Amino acid sequence: MNALFIIIFMIVVGAIIGGVTNVIAIRMLFHPFKPYYIFKFRVPFTPGLIPKRREEIATKIGQVIEEHLLTETLINEKLKSEQSQQAIESMIQQQLQKLTKDQLSIKQITSQIDIDLEQVLQTNGNQYIASQLNNYYTKHQNQTIASLLPNQLVTFLDQHVDNATDLLCDRARNYLSSAKGTQDINDMLDTFFNEKGKLIGMLQMFMTKESIADRIQQELIRLTSHPKARAIVTSLITNEYQTFKDKSLNKLLDTSQFNEIAENLSMYVTTYASKQANKPVVTLMPQFVDYLESQLSSKLANLIIEQLSIHLSTIMKKVDLRGLIEEQINTFDLDYIEKLIIEIANKELKLIMSLGFILGGIIGFFQGLVAIFV
């Protein structure tokens, strides 16, 4: 009976010692958080292992993640996977559908990225357009108009300048034949008669004002179709056209005139652009939106993946994944790290404590046997 008591006692004592030792060892991984001193001598095992090696642990974790987990090769493969392609394309499609559904305007789109488009157009647009026009004038002011116009346009004008005669004569004939033309001729005759006085009064003894106006009108209409009159008009137009082509830009417009035109043109362009920017994109450019939805989403997804893949090495160097993880771990409170590790390895830590009790009990059993027989 005595022997059994000794064995049981030794088992209990051994189990307590083994279990408590493991519990203390586990606690010493985390505690204390700071070193303790007695008369300038640091107490051994303070701080605990994890607080003491915290920076080394953070460095090693960052190294392992960068070199073995989130590697450039792995991320590149993931980027080029069909799943990533579909995810990016789906995201682009959602944004395009939102553009159509919400009737978003260009101004609303730019405001989402903190750009006041109207202010940009008013402050920078006017200045930029006027500056570009003035630079163009300074650079080309001594060149002829013909040299500044596109060759195709000059060729077209050269071939069709004679058509201006037909156009002018037709317009003149239509005007003279109209009620407005008749009225204007009568008004001019009244003015002429009033100015010439008695001489015209004598003429009216033979012809009425109406007959004179009618004769003048018919003669003017006839002149619009007369070959010689048309030849004169053609010659005048051709000469003026050639003179216009041969003029230099600064002869056609001096600096002040061009500056005024540039200012007015820039104001018109920016005002027009500002008005258009308030219209929904789907209304302003329906064909472009259709193209975006049908074709661009896939192309844009491929472009994004391709560019990310090309610049992935540079991006990862800039991000510095290892340094980022190390910095983040070092910002964690030690209480949080302890809680995190215990949550992750709770089952294993309990097994270690249980193993301490079991091993201590086994050692106590053998010690009891030794105590009985020795």
From Swiss-Prot:
Instruction: Kindly state which keywords UniProt assigns to this record, in alphabetical order.
Output: Cell membrane, Membrane, Transmembrane, Transmembrane helix
Where in the cell does this protein reside?
A: Cell membrane
Superkingdom classification of source: Bacteria
Q: Which InterPro entries match?
A: DUF445, UCP032178
Stretches that traverse the bilayer: 4-24, 354-374
Topological category with respect to the lipid bilayer: Multi-pass membrane protein
Record carries keyword Transmembrane helix: yes
Q: How far does the signal peptide extend, from start to end residue?
A: none
Q: Name one GO cellular component term.
A: plasma membrane
**Similarity remark:** Belongs to the UPF0754 family.
The name of this protein is UPF0754 membrane protein SAR1937
- Originating species: Staphylococcus aureus (strain MRSA252)
